Amino acid sequence: TDNPISGFWTAGRGYIAGDWVNWGGGGWNLLGNPFTSAMNADQFITENALDFDPYYQALYVYDGKNGYYRYVASIIPGYNDPGIVQGGTFGSRIQAGQGFMVMANNNGVTFNFNSSMQVHNTALPLLKSAATEDPWPGLKLNVKWGEKENMTTIVFNDDMKNSLDPGYDVGLLSTGPDVEIYTAIADKDESVNLTRQALPIAGVDTVKIPVGVDCYAGAEVTFSAL
């Protein structure tokens, strides 16, 4: 097929990733919440973890008002604020009828939906435990050009690695904005731009994190850290 985004539904509310012309893996596929209720995005990701490209183990929701994608990925304590500037998270609930993009690991994988993912009262918080987890140390690196802003997140935890941590390191789905900032995997040369990167605390004073900025030639940008 010459359709860059294609696929079909299967019995049992599954979705098989279709072909992407000249793409090595399953490519980007457009899915949506098939339920008449909200859907628990975290549970959907957990159930289908092996079907995602490991650099993009997330759901990407397009923010039409601002013209960029927000992501839903593994929750990191202290960094799940859906109200932050471009490059931020979307939260953990996908409302009925809401579409989202996924990067399939290869052609033919199946993304499964089941009724246990349904959430009927979105006003209630998702309670994972009785205690509140301590926020991970880290920063939100912001770049600004004129009135345009973009952000990338870097966090630290002893369970993370300098290499890829699927679901915690989140690839960037870019819309080509006026200004954009991202990082790359710290321990090797990678071509995947990340909107969020998780690293170990040990050795944090010596690790070098590649940071990239896309903007108009000659533009003057301002950096800040939150």
Residue ranges and their predicted role:
Residues D2-L226:
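Compositionally biased Ser/Thr/Gly- and acidic/asparagine-rich
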